[in-house]
């Protein structure tokens, strides 16, 4: 159902203290479990240190590129038309694009086999930057699904 009143203003997120970046702050907030923000911050910054040691590249740039590579351009939504459910491809809004990229990076980092969450995050960032990794695979699977269902794009709403 649509809202009767005006649009809801998105909450302002204060940028993180180290890189002064809102996307880093959002990532840390999504990484946080049970309100333990200091733990999430430590994990994130430790992961960036691990990236620095492993690759020698700027870890912040690695993170930004990994996040950019993990963001989906299109996704599919189910739409019921005349008793048949179609998977309709739609373009992803920029806010949702960022949210999905962050969510996938965190989810697939947690599923990895490395020891310690910081090293899992670091490994996922490095792979995502290179264009491999589970988060990128998820993005590609969804893109392929949207491509396969392109015929139903006129059911968009």
Curated annotation (Swiss-Prot):
Q: Which Pfam families match?
A: Ribosomal_S7 (PF00177)
- Cite the Gene3D superfamilies for this sequence: Ribosomal protein S7 domain
Q: Which GO terms describe its cellular component?
A: small ribosomal subunit
**TM stretches of this protein:** none
**CDD domains, per the entry:** uS7_Bacteria
Gene Ontology biological process: translation
The alphabetical list of record keywords is:
Ribonucleoprotein, Ribosomal protein, RNA-binding, rRNA-binding, tRNA-binding
Subunit info? Part of the 30S ribosomal subunit. Contacts proteins S9 and S11.
Enumerate the NCBIfam families for this protein: rpsG_bact (TIGR01029)
Return the protein name. Small ribosomal subunit protein uS7
Q: Which organism is it from?
A: Leptospira borgpetersenii serovar Hardjo-bovis (strain JB197)
What phylogenetic lineage does the species belong to? Bacteria, Pseudomonadati, Spirochaetota, Spirochaetia, Leptospirales
